[in-house]
């Protein structure tokens, strides 16, 4: 097969040689014989068959197509002959021949031949027949083509024939012929477009403006600017002319007038002037082709077709011109110094430049310079100079030096920022000096100017650096790197400094290395960066910490200098970098407030080494990881973690930007009012400096003043050169001056002049700040320091302003004293102020003539192609007027607006602009764009709607993606995502440091290309990263995610954009109203080589331009303003196109959140784990406890015991904290802080191994046949009778959010959402809980739901220190009822397994401390020895990360099994609890870590988490210390461990103690942000091994009774608190106290039986109402423990109250044996058991049913049924509390008694019913019968007396219910 080869720069002969070769012609012949196209998008028409039949024409067209294809090649391409013919050629010919006709083919062949062969090809007349000739209002398209042809053929002839080349001659000739042709050929055009007559006048104006833009530098290159601007402007004018003619229907379609002119006229002119036989002809023409192609792509509309899909160009702007030229040159010359690519890749490759357009142009000129030398052998000084001047922005550099000089003259000092800028300018100067020394030679004039500017800048910097400013300053930005020795923190600091220097443009000598042990700051010269290595490693008289206090401050601080002339130097460096081994202040640091030191470290980096990564000498950061620490709440918290250096650098740069903005805001007002103080209080202090500089000065003074009276009182002030000699000036303390002229010894000259600089600066500072110098003089300092204005005797002889003005100032000038004039003249000499002309202008004026002559001579000898190309590049830099015109025209649309814009743009008539603008209603909004008006575009034709939501959307969702100088618009989406456009982001193939600028702030981000998802059949792409800052999830509703359903086919929309203007350096929010339409039709987006075909788009008529991509299309959808699309491309400069939003899924949100919450636009109080995102809507209220249920008992009940506990703080403003520093303590808010800092990520491999080991142990102890699947909702609600650990769901607790919002007075808990008989309940259909349960059941199958929890302060007893010293109330989280039910369904069996197998597993949930289980735990721990770690965690609830929770979910799924659906549900349920919303009073918070305390699996998950942490760090430590691998894999054999939530005990075998102990474990966990302390002594700084007898677990100790028996005594401090405070929620105080006292006696028995007996006696003696039978005896307690140890009575609640057992009622009333189904007390009163009877469905009119303690909702019962519920009183045998009995039974008018009497009166049977246990109901029935006279008191007395005889504890009935015993 024959291959065609195309490559950049390939000559025409090479192309023809290939296409005329025999092998290729064989393929052509085969192609001519075929009648198939083999392409779906190409149709074989009659015209195509006619072309194939004519062999000569076919061959000519193939040659033309090959030459055309060659011009598009940017890199070498090999193509099969058949691929070329059936592909490119067939596509091109099909479009030309089929759509345009044979005449168009003729013109195509002629154009290609004329362009490449420079010959005019004549074709037989048969082909000139016009198949399609379009006429429009008498305007013939053929005549337009003839016009362009005439212009194209005239230009080269005219240029060739010109003698005495001049710019004016060319422009005049162009103008003359251009008008002549238009007048003769198209007379209508001049009438339609009269502005054509002024085009060339406007071009001349643009050239003059461009010359002015660069002052003297461009004086000699006006020829280049003429070529460039003439080319660009002519193309622009012709293009506008064509668009207007089409609009006015003089043309039916575009014929690309400007393109034809550009490709023929300009190129042909260059060819005629540059011989084809000249050296480098082919290459030079390729360069010109690159330039003209770029012009066509940027300035002209690009029309191209040929396929069924429409191709659209991605939007471009003037910067694109230079990008395209750079890309073309790179492809032509592979040896270019830099390789500049397309789009943002090109910008990124020069990211080290200063982000200016001139820098980019300088690089392009460098490529042209290299090209001219290598190809043409032409060494051009102009291109070398231009590359330097533009590439390094020499002009701007000189202007800034001039501004700094003038600022110094006006103030006599340089500020902190000015010195910083001097350092930046010095570095740029040094780089330019290096370029001149190593690169191409520049002109001597340019070189000398740069060297002079650098010398002046060095002098200015030297003078300012030794001065210091006694005024307010910015607080320096401090970065501390902390870590262990040999972790590379010093290297890290060095690398950070280097990168900060590069980022800020600073040089290497801008760092001062400070030794804190030295008193003096020797060598300090106001360097912007100070580095302190090994901070505080060595003690000093003034500690390093103490020194830092004054350095990091905004107040002036004078540093101690050794030299007297440097006294008064103040510190004002802007950066401090330090490395240290210490986190805290040294005990000898003499710092009285540690926080003052801590707060001065703005970035504190904790440097760690990655154990799995080897050290790399070429990249020491490869094995480092970084934790960012912040000190808060008494500890260091990890606020960010980075695994690579680039992300750390981005974080530091962002923090510095924030710090800098804060400092600017803080000091703005202070700087306005601040007054600079001189370092010299008296003039004699200035004079005394001379004695310290040089011995030569003193000798000169003595010799010169030998004859002067009082010579010893004079001090030499300065010596400066003047008129070939040296002027000497001396002064005394009385301001008297002596001056003389004389020589200076050569050996002392430099020394004397340098000393004079310092003294002059001091004198000038003293003078300028002196009260003697009047304000008028200060305002004219430039003239007064001009040395030309002083005569030989230093008398002022100049003129200030015009003569009249000077006369007004003459009195003030004459008032100047001699020492004033002497100092002003001296400082003028020092600053080089020889005349009033500004320094910057003098620099250029000095070389103006030299450059003009050199450049004009050199450029005249260049080949024309090089002139045109360079001219085009120069216009890209300085053609501001032209580009402004282009911007106006491209934004003017295609209608009447374009006509008006063309008239204004190309006319030289002055226009007036109103100096007031239309008020913008959006300026009153508090958005980022408040002070930047949202302006309507020139082509917008409607007023913006009154709805402010459009601006709100812009503020919330718009952002800019900034890479170097490129600003791309992006759209932020909730879930840490943004939407971009593919033709931009596809070029970013490597990680990059970028900036994200939102409406609120700008931050650095490390862009990771792998996180970008490109959407199929869309031009949009979606980027996601956890490092992106999220936006409010309420913004989700601002997007139209379902356009097929919501969006109409046609609609009116707002085109909203916020672009960065590279010219004004500002943000420009703009909008326009567009009429949009959804089009389902293929269109292709083109951007260079990029192609993407999309089937659906939003289209609108709008002349959009480059950088519009990313703009939002916003319209009203369903009554709400939403984003419906994102702009991605434009076509024909009149059609805009947007892509519909990609099909994204929302992040899981809590159902109904928007109904109850007002979400903030941004998050507040954000930390790593939490952020405040909203608040409850007005008038909504979450009921929380406001007062404690704990009641203080009388003093005598305390029995002399101490108590250090009080009830916790439940509300803000607790009166106990009034008038204290904690008066504003908020317990709800404080409880959230534990979630602020989750633990760091763990190594995934090691974590996986750890979890697998735990999972294997679960399987090892799994009983055969044990059920692990999910349970039914009935079992989840009611539990399973007879099965341990399968208890029912507690119904008295809160129902959670949002159900609590519907709670009415008197209602509480979950009971109101269930129905049943009290034992078997079910959800009531139709309630909010039932509906939420159904919804959540479906949701968890596919996604992680977002829960809403209520943070509720915990009502408990706390130590005094946690209430008064440092308040700390614990919160528990109330989760929704439906979530708790589902968790029970899917995890109840797993929980049952964990609790049941606690004898072999570490988790001890369910342990009975009174039983033998405690002894078993002790035995397990002792099996490894007696070295035990007793551990406690800090803020354990907030540590758990999503990484750990996901691992636990996977473990449980693998263990419990089930299908994919069940596993997904389990995992989503678990993941939901560590990513939720929390309501704290009226605030709504987002929490992204930890386990809520109200989670049903909290204690189980925490126990497993506890075990994972210990086992993970065990393996980690043993691996780090190279322990035998057998030890690493033998945790179970070498470690015994028990856990209960965050409590643990770890018994360590002696063989692994060298590798695993408390110190190593504490340090290893701290590396991951986990703080673990000694569980016994929480204040201890160490974690040491303890004996088992010294440990505690669950606040219980280990007391050995025998070799096998261990007791678990509770801490006495907890026991005594039970006697001081009791909970009276469900019983009376006496009953509650007695219950607590019994528990205390039991616990004391485990401490010492004797102590228990004595305490019992004390209680009976001190409390009169106690009976001996109320308290258990020693033997009863002993028997209790015996039963517990035999496991006769399991204890599920850690305590057993036998007095609450209903069995105490015995068989009374029903007699001996099994209870019966019913008890008939009388004909009208009966008690029934609902196990055997059912509640009636309707009212039969004969019975009244009273149900007790069932769950039947009253509203669902028939009218004759009534439901009552009571709480059982403790010690009352299942009977209700005394309060309930008194309220409902004793009180005669209670509702219950009224029901009884009403039924009796109606002769209805009264049925009292309950389920299961009717014994208490029997007693209540007797009491009700007595109270309502249903039974006589004699009968009720007998019954109750019998009952009390069997259960003597019920004796309280005789006193509480006397009516049942006596007739009262």
UniProtKB/Swiss-Prot annotation:
Active site residues of this protein: 983, 1019, 1109
Residues given in the record as ATP binding sites: 483-490
Species of the source: Red clover mottle virus
Catalyzed reactions per annotation: RNA(n) + a ribonucleoside 5'-triphosphate = RNA(n+1) + diphosphate
Lineage: Viruses, Riboviria, Orthornavirae, Pisuviricota, Pisoniviricetes
Protein name (record): RNA1 polyprotein
Ranges for domain SF3 helicase: 457-622
Domain Peptidase C3: from-to ranges: 943-1146
EC numbers on record: 3.6.4.-, 3.4.22.-, 2.7.7.48
């Amino acid at each position: 097969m024959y291959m065609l080869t195309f490559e950049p720069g390939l000559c025409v002969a090479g192309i023809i040689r290939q296409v005329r070769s025999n092998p290729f012609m064989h393929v052509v012949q085969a192609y001519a014989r075929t009648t198939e196209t083999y392409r779906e998008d190409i149709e074989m028409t009659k015209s195509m068959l006619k072309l194939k039949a004519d062999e000569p024409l076919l061959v000519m067209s193939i040659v033309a197509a090959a030459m055309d294809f060659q011009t598009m090649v940017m890199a070498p391409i090999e193509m099969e002959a058949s691929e070329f013919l059936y592909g490119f050629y067939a596509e091109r010919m099909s479009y030309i021949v089929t759509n345009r006709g044979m005449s168009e083919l003729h013109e195509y062949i002629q154009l290609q031949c004329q362009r490449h062969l420079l010959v005019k090809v004549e074709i037989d007349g048969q082909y000139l027949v016009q198949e399609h000739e379009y006429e429009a209002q008498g305007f013939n398209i053929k005549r337009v083509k003839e016009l362009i042809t005439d212009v194209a053929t005239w230009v080269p002839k005219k240029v060739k024939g010109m003698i005495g080349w001049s710019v004016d001659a060319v422009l005049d000739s162009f103008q003359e012929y251009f008008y002549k042709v238009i007048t003769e050929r198209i007379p209508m055009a001049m009438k339609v477009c009269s502005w054509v007559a002024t085009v060339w006048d406007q071009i001349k104006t643009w050239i003059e403006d461009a010359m002015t833009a660069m002052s003297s530098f461009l004086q000699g290159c006006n020829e280049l600017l003429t070529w460039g601007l003439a080319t660009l402007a002519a193309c622009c004018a012709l293009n506008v002319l064509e668009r207007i003619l089409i609009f006015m229907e003089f043309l039916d379609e575009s014929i690309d007038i400007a393109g034809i002119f550009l490709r023929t006229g300009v190129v042909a002119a260059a060819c005629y002037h540059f011989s084809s036989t000249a050296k480098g002809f082919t290459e030079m023409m390729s360069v010109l082709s690159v330039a003209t192609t770029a012009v066509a792509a940027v300035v002209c509309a690009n029309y191209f077709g040929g396929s069924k899909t429409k191709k659209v160009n991605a939007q471009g702007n003037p910067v694109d011109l230079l990008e395209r030229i750079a890309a073309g040159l790179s492809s032509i010359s592979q040896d270019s110094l830099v390789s500049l690519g397309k789009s943002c890749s090109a910008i990124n490759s020069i990211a080290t430049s200063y982000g200016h357009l001139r820098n980019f142009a300088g690089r392009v000129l460098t490529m042209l310079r290299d090209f001219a030398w290598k190809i043409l052998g032409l060494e051009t000084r102009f291109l070398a100079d231009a590359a330097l001047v533009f590439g390094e922005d020499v002009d701007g550099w000189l202007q800034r030096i001039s501004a700094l000089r003038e600022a110094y003259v006006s103030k006599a000092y340089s500020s902190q920022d000015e010195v910083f800028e001097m350092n930046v300018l010095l570095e740029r100067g040094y780089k330019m000096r290096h370029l001149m020394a190593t690169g191409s030679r520049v002109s001597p004039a340019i070189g000398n100017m740069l060297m002079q500017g650098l010398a002046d800048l060095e002098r200015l910097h030297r003078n300012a650096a030794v001065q210091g400013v006694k005024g307010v300053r910015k607080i320096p930005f401090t970065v501390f790197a902390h870590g262990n020795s040999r972790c590379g923190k010093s290297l890290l600091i060095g690398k950070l400094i280097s990168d900060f220097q590069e980022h800020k443009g600073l040089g290497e000598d801008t760092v001062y290395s400070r030794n804190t042990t030295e008193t003096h700051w020797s060598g300090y010269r106001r360097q912007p960066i100070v580095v302190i290595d090994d901070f505080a490693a060595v003690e000093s008289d003034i500690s390093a910490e103490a020194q830092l206090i004054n350095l990091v401050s905004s107040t002036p601080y004078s540093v101690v200098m050794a030299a007297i002339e440097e006294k008064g130097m103040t510190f004002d460096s802007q950066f401090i970098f330090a490395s240290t081994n210490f986190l805290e202040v040294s005990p000898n640091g003499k710092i009285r407030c540690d926080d003052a030191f801590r707060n001065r470290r703005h970035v504190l980096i904790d440097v760690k080494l990655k154990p799995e990564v080897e050290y790399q000498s070429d990249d020491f950061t490869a094995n480092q990881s970084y934790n960012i620490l912040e000190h808060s709440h008494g500890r260091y918290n990890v606020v960010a973690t980075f695994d690579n250096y680039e992300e750390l650098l981005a974080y530091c740069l962002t923090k510095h930007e924030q710090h800098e903005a804060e400092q600017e805001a803080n000091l703005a007002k202070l700087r306005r009012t601040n007054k600079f103080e001189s370092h010299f209080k008296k003039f004699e202090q200035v004079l005394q400096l001379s004695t310290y500089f040089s011995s030569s000065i003193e000798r000169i003074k003595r010799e010169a003043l030998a004859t002067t009276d009082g010579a010893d009182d004079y001090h030499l002030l300065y010596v400066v050169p003047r008129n070939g000699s040296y002027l000497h000036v001396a002064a005394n303390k009385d301001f008297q001056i002596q001056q003389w002229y004389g020589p200076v010894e050569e050996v002392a000259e430099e020394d004397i002049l340098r000393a004079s600089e310092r003294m002059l600066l001091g004198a000038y500072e003293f003078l300028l700040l002196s009260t003697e110098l009047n304000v008028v003089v200060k305002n004219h300092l430039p003239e007064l320091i001009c040395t030309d204005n002083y005569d030989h005797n230093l008398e002022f002889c100049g003129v200030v302003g015009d003569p009249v003005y000077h006369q007004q100032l003459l009195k003030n000038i004459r008032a100047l004293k001699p020492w004033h004039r002497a100092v002003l003249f001296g400082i003028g000499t020092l600053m080089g102020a020889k005349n009033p002309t500004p320094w910057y202008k003098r620099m250029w004026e000095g070389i103006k003539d030299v450059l003009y002559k050199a450049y004009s001579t050199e450029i005249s000898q260049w080949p024309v192609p090089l002139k045109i190309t360079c001219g085009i590049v120069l216009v890209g830099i300085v053609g501001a007027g032209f580009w402004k015109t282009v911007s106006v025209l491209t934004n003017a649309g295609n209608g009447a607006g374009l006509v008006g814009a063309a008239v204004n743009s190309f006319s030289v008539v002055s226009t007036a602009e109103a100096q007031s603008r239309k008020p913008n209603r959006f300026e009153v909004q508090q958005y980022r764009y408040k002070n930047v008006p949202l302006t309507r575009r020139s082509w917008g034709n409607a007023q913006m709607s009154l709805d402010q939501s459009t601006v709100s959307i812009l503020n919330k969702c718009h952002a800019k993606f900034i890479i170097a100088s490129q600003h791309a618009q992006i759209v932020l989406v909730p879930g840490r995502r943004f939407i971009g456009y593919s033709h931009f982001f596809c070029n970013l193939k490597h990680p990059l440091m970028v900036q994200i600028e939102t409406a609120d702030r700008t931050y650095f981000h490390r862009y990771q290309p792998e996180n970008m998802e490109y959407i199929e059949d869309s031009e949009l792409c979606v980027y996601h990263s956890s490092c992106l800052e999220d936006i409010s999830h309420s913004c989700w509703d601002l997007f139209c995610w379902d356009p097929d359903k919501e969006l109409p086919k046609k609609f009116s929309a707002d085109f909203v954009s916020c672009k960065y203007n590279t010219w004004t350096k500002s943000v420009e929010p703009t909008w326009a109203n567009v009429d949009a339409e959804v089009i389902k039709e293929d269109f292709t987006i083109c951007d260079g080589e990029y192609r993407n075909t999309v089937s659906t788009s939003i289209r609108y008529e709008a002349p959009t331009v480059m950088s519009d991509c990313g703009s939002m299309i916003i319209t009203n959808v369903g009554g709400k303003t939403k984003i419906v699309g994102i702009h991605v491309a434009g076509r024909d400069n009149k059609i805009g196109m947007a892509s519909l939003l990609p099909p994204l899924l929302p992040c899981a949100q809590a159902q109904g959140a928007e109904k109850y919450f007002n979400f903030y636009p941004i998050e507040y109080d954000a930390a790593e784990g939490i952020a405040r995102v909203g608040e409850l809507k007005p008038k909504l209220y979450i009921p929380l406890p406001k007062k404690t249920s704990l009641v203080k008992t009388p003093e005598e009940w305390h029995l002399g015991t101490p108590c250090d506990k009080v009830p916790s703080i439940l509300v803000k403003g607790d009166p106990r904290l009034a008038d204290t520093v904690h008066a504003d303590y908020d317990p709800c808010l404080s409880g959230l802080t534990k979630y602020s800092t989750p633990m760091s990520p763990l190594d995934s491999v090691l974590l996986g191994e750890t979890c697998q080991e735990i999972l294997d142990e679960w399987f090892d102890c799994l009983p055969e046949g044990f059920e692990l699947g999910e349970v039914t909702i009935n079992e989840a609600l009611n539990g399973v009778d007879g099965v341990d650990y399968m208890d029912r769901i507690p119904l008295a607790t809160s129902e959670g959010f949002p159900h609590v919002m519907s709670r009415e007075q008197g209602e509480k808990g979950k009971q109101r959402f269930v129905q049943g008989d009290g034992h078997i309940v079910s959800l009531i259909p139709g309630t909010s809980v039932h509906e939420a349960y159904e919804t959540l059941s479906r949701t968890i199958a596919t996604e992680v739901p977002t829960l809403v929890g209520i943070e509720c302060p915990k009502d408990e007893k706390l130590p005094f220190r946690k209430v008064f010293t440092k308040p700390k109330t614990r919160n528990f989280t109330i989760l929704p009822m439906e979530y708790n039910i589902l968790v029970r369904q899917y995890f109840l069996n797993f929980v049952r397994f964990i609790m049941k197998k606690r004898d072999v597993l570490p988790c001890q949930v369910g342990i009975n401390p009174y039983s033998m289980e405690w002894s078993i735990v002790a035995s397990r721990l002792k099996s490894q020895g007696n070295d035990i770690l007793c551990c406690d965690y800090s803020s354990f609830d907030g540590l758990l990360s999503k990484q750990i929770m996901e691992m636990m979910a996977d473990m449980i799924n693998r263990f419990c099994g089930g299908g994919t659906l069940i596993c997904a549900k389990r995992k989503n349920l678990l993941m939901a609890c560590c990513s939720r919303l929390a309501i704290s009073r009226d605030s709504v918070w987002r929490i992204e870590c930890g386990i809520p305390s109200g989670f049903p699996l909290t204690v189980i998950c925490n126990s497993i988490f506890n075990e994972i942490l210990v086992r993970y760090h065990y393996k980690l430590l043993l691996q780090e210390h190279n322990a035998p691998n057998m030890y690493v894999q033998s945790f179970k054999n070498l470690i015994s461990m028990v856990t209960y939530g965050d409590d643990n005990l770890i018994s360590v075998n002696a063989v692994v103690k060298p590798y695993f102990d408390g110190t190593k474990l504490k340090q290893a966990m701290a590396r991951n942000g986990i703080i673990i302390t000694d569980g016994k002594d929480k204040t201890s700084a160490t974690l040491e091994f303890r004996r088992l007898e010294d440990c505690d677990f669950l606040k219980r100790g280990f007391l050995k009774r025998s070799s096998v028996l261990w007791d678990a005594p509770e801490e006495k401090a907890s026991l005594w608190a039970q006697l001081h405070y009791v909970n009276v929620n469900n019983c009376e105080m006496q009953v509650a106290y007695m219950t607590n006292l019994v528990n205390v006696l039991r616990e004391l028995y485990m401490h010492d039986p004797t102590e228990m007996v004595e305490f019992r006696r004390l209680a009976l003696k001190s409390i009169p109402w106690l009976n001996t039978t109320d308290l258990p005896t020693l033997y009863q307690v002993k028997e209790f423990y015996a039963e517990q140890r035999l496991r006769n009575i399991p204890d599920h609640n850690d305590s057993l109250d036998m007095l609450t057992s209903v069995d105490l009622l015995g068989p009374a009333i029903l007699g001996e044996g099994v209870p019966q189904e019913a008890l008939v007390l009388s004909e009208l009163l009966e008690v029934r058991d609902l196990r055997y009877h059912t509640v009636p469905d309707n009212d039969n009119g004969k019975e009244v049913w009273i149900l007790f303690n069932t769950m039947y909702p009253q509203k669902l019962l028939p009218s004759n049924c009534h439901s009552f519920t009571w709480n059982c009183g403790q010690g009352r045998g299942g009977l209700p509390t005394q309060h309930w009995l008194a309220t409902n039974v004793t009180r005669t008018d209670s509702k219950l008694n009224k029901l009884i009497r009403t039924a009796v009166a109606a002769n209805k049977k009264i049925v009292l019913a309950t389920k299961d246990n009717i014994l208490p109901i029997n007693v209540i029935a007797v009491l009700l019968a007595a109270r309502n006279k249903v039974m006589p008191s004699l009968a009720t007395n007998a019954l109750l007396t019998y009952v009390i005889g069997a259960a003597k504890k019920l004796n309280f009935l005789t006193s509480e219910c006397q009516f049942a015993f006596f007739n009262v």
